[in-house]
């Protein structure tokens, strides 16, 4: 049996086991997916511990996505650029790090038929979640990428390696019609379901609204967007997509789209 798992600090309500167990079943993989709750005292021994336990692959979540990087032998191009690893592969005694949030975001857009090349994207929020999204948009030849934050100067230093523009929320109020608006902030996430990062006036200026929040599935941001005629995309398929990509890395397989869809539909019923 192959052993896999999720590494983090507080993992009580993770949906990851359901995603991975479905992939195991559909691909005849004899696998076991565990939750590994790691105290901060042991954060410097994560990869060595995985090797000792015989773990083949692991997902990494808050607060260890950055801290685990210096423990790895090889880090993928996208993970280096993003500055975070959320997937580890242990193979032939070596450890490899990847960022499958990058691919999960791509799968989310592909499924929703949102074209990137030649279009403009405005990203709300400058936390860790924004980095994988900015990198994917950059690599996919978006015409214009704008990072919207409360402190433009501070964020410029943090994201100076990206080929993007910077804007404050006040400046966002003054823009004209653009293509897509992406929420990467926790605004609207349960239990703060009434919060939204921008006004309806701003939302109306876009054609597409995407939210990486998936609980609830339709956030206040997406509801406002839908009511104003925008195409809306929820964040659940990004979660599914990043998990599926991890399985492809760990097991050297190509997961069928029907499996991704079935996982999405099963999880959707939860929210």
Curated annotation (Swiss-Prot):
Residues at which shikimate binds: 14-16, 61, 86, 101, 214
First and last residue of the signal peptide: none
Binding site for NADP(+): 125-129, 212, 235
Provenance organism: Clostridium perfringens (strain SM101 / Type A)
Keyword annotations of the record: Amino-acid biosynthesis, Aromatic amino acid biosynthesis, NADP, Oxidoreductase
EC class (word): oxidoreductase
Annotated metabolic or biological route of this protein: Metabolic intermediate biosynthesis; chorismate biosynthesis; chorismate from D-erythrose 4-phosphate and phosphoenolpyruvate: step 4/7
Identification of the protein by name: Shikimate dehydrogenase (NADP(+))
Keyword Ribosomal protein in annotation: no
KW NADP (keyword) present: yes
InterPro entries tied to this protein: Aminoacid_DH-like_N_sf, NAD(P)-bd_dom_sf, Shikimate_DH, Shikimate_DH-bd_N, Shikimate_DH_fam, Shikm_DH/Glu-tRNA_Rdtase
GO molecular function, one term: NADP binding
Record's subunit section: Homodimer.
Role: Involved in the biosynthesis of the chorismate, which leads to the biosynthesis of aromatic amino acids. Catalyzes the reversible NADPH linked reduction of 3-dehydroshikimate (DHSA) to yield shikimate (SA).
């Amino acid at each position: 049996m192959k052993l896999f798992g999720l590494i983090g600090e507080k993992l009580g309500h993770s949906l990851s086991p359901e995603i991975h167990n479905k992939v195991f079943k559909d691909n005849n993989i004899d696998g076991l997916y565990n939750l590994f709750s790691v105290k901060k005292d042991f954060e410097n021994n994560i990869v060595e511990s995985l090797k000792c336990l015989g773990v083949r692959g692991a997902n990494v979540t808050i607060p260890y996505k950055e801290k685990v990087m210096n423990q790895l032998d090889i880090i993928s191009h996208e993970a280096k650029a993003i500055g975070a690893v959320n997937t580890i592969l242990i193979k032939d005694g070596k450890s490899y790090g990847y960022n499958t949030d990058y691919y999960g975001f791509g799968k989310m857009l592909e499924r929703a038929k949102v074209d990137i090349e030649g279009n403009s994207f405005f990203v709300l929020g400058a936390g860790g979640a924004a980095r994988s999204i900015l990198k994917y948009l950059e690599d996919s030849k978006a015409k214009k990428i704008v990072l919207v934050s409360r402190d433009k100067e501070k964020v410029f230093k943090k994201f100076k390696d990206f080929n993007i523009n910077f804007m404050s929320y006040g400046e966002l109020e003054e823009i004209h019609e653009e293509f897509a608006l992406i929420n990467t902030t926790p605004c609207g996430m349960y239990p703060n379901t009434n919060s939204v990062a921008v006004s309806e006036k701003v939302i109306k200026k876009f054609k597409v609204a995407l939210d990486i929040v998936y609980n609830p599935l339709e956030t206040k941001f997406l509801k406002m967007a839908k009511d104003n005629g925008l195409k809306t995309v929820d964040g659940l398929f990004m979660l599914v997509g990043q998990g599926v990509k991890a399985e492809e890395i760990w097991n050297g397989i190509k997961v069928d789209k029907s499996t991704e869809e079935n996982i999405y539909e099963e999880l959707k019923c939860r929210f």
